[in-house]
Amino acid sequence: MYVKLCPGGVMHEHQDSGKRIHIILKTNPDAVMTIDGIEYRPELGGIYLMDVSLPHSSVNNGTTDRIHLVLL
C-alpha cells in the first residue's frame, strides 16, 4: 500500500502487529517518524524493516508530500 503524509500531516502514535517494510519514495528533511520514542528521518530510496508492534507516529513539517510504499 502507498502511504502519503501531506505537508503539515500527522499520524498519531499507535501500535499495529508484526513487521512491515517501508520503501521511501518521496520525503523531505522535516518528515519525521518516531518509533518507540526515537526519531528517524528515513532517506529517499531507503528500505526499512519496521517493527510496528512498537508505538510509532509520523509528522510531516515539510512543504512537500512524504510517500512510502509499505509492504505488509
Question: What name fits each language-model region?
Answer:
Residues 1-7:
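A short glycine-rich, His/Asp/Glu-containing loop-to-beta-strand
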Residues 4, 15-31:
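Short, conserved beta-strand element in jelly-roll/cupin
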Residues 7-8, 45, 53:
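Tight coil/turn sites that cap or link beta-strands
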Residues 12-14, 31-33, 50-62:
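Short beta-strand His + acidic residue motifs that chelate non-heme Fe in jelly-roll/DSBH
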Residues 21-24, 47-49, 63-72:
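A short hydrophobic beta-strand segment most commonly corresponding to one strand
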Residues 24-44:
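A short beta-strand-loop-beta hairpin characteristic of the jelly-roll/cupin
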